[in-house]
Swiss-Prot record:
Gene3D superfamilies, A to Z: 3.30.70.60
Disordered, as annotated region: 99-119
Listed GO CC annotations: cytoplasm; ribonucleoprotein complex; ribosome
PANTHER family the record matches: MITOCHONDRIAL 28S RIBOSOMAL PROTEIN S6, SMALL RIBOSOMAL SUBUNIT PROTEIN BS6M
Disulphide connectivity of cysteines: none
HAMAP family cross-referenced by the UniProt entry: Ribosomal_bS6
Record-given protein name: Small ribosomal subunit protein bS6
UniProt-listed InterPro entries: Ribosomal_bS6, Ribosomal_bS6_sf, Ribosomal_S6_plastid/chlpt, Transl_elong_EF1B/ribsomal_bS6
A Pfam family of this chain: Ribosomal_S6
GO biological process: one example: translation
């Protein structure tokens, strides 16, 4: 199963409750439209940007970790593109986390096999 991370930046002049709804809307979209399993949502809140984004020096940052098989990420990119409240977004595959998870599962399988041999 592939693991993805998406970070999106929301305009800071939107009310806090509305920004929460927007972030939850992304999570719901991932679950309902893409069929993804959301592992973690990390809300950073309003932070200073490295450079002005559409005349904003601050923005609300959110990172979402999700997983799925055969996900069409371009659909998620379109979701961000048509909504003006998003200043920036980036989605990428986390191959490092996939490898770590595979290594962990192999280690667990190895310990199960050694227990069976001892019995």
């Amino acid at each position: 199963m592939r693991i993805y991370e998406t970070m999106f930046i929301i305009k800071p002049d939107i009310a806090e409750e509305e920004r929460e709804k927007i972030a939850q809307g992304v999570v719901d979209y991932l679950k309902e439209k893409l069929g993804a399993h959301v592992d973690n949502v990390d809300r950073w809140g309003i932070r200073k940007t490295a450079y002005p984004l559409k005349k904003y020096n601050e923005a609300d940052y959110t990172i979402v970790y999700f997983r799925g098989e055969g996900l069409d990420i371009t659909v998620l990119e379109s979701y961000f593109r048509v909504r003006p409240e998003f200043l920036r977004w980036q989605t990428f595959r986390r191959i490092d986390l996939e490898k770590k998870e595979k290594k962990q599962s192999r280690k667990e399988e190895g310990s199960e096999n050694s227990e069976k041999v001892e019995e």
